[in-house]
Swiss-Prot record:
One of its GO terms (cellular component) is cytoplasm. This is Probable transaldolase. Its EC number is 2.2.1.2. The keyword Cytoplasm applies. It is found in: Cytoplasm. It catalyses: D-sedoheptulose 7-phosphate + D-glyceraldehyde 3-phosphate = D-erythrose 4-phosphate + beta-D-fructose 6-phosphate. Belongs to the transaldolase family. Type 3B subfamily. It comes from Dinoroseobacter shibae (strain DSM 16493 / NCIMB 14021 / DFL 12). The active site is at K83. It is an enzyme of class 2 (transferase). It comes from the Bacteria. InterPro entries: Aldolase_TIM, TAL/FSA, Transaldolase_3B, Transaldolase_3B/F6P_aldolase, Transaldolase_AS, TSA/FSA_arc/bac.
Amino acid sequence: MKFFVDTADVAAIAELNDLGMVDGVTTNPSLILKSGRDITEVTKEICELVDGPVSAEVVATQADAMIAEGRKLAEIAENITVKLPLTWDGLKACKTLTDEGKMVNVTLCFSANQALLAAKAGASFISPFIGRLDDLNVDGMELIEDIRTIYDNYGYETEILAASIRTVNHMKEAALIGADVATAPPGVIKQMANHVLTDKGLAAFLSDWEKTGQKIL
């Protein structure tokens, strides 16, 4: 499973990228606001840092305007993925932009029916939102499983990009189900290294080593 980082924080992306943990990046208007930076400037910097797809989101709501914004965003770098909302206008824009050879990430997906439409419109990625479904006491992972089954049944090449990831368990479940990609905040990715028994075992080893009175360096 590929890891995308869900942030516009360049320093956080760089830290994970140095460890080989970054296969791509996703941003949205909220993350751009949080960064406090100009969208073109920060997106270009991210694209120069990361080789993989970098999602940049349109803010228009009508198809023609979405297409125009998507074309503008795609000029930033070759690895830009235009991010579009899963609306009827978004699907129209998706079809046009993918026909032009641009990568498209269709976002705010909350049903398998929506995911099927996005695949038929030629989306490069579909982004089902796990955490927001969980907020409504709906199993977000069941949606990932349904989309995986549908895409496999018919050979769709659209990649499933599990989004709205909030916990390390979300990451594990997405990998088990077969999501192609999971995008998560830097903190969640780093938390995947943590386990109480690892900490306990390390403490015991270090305590015993100290008792030997030896040094390695």
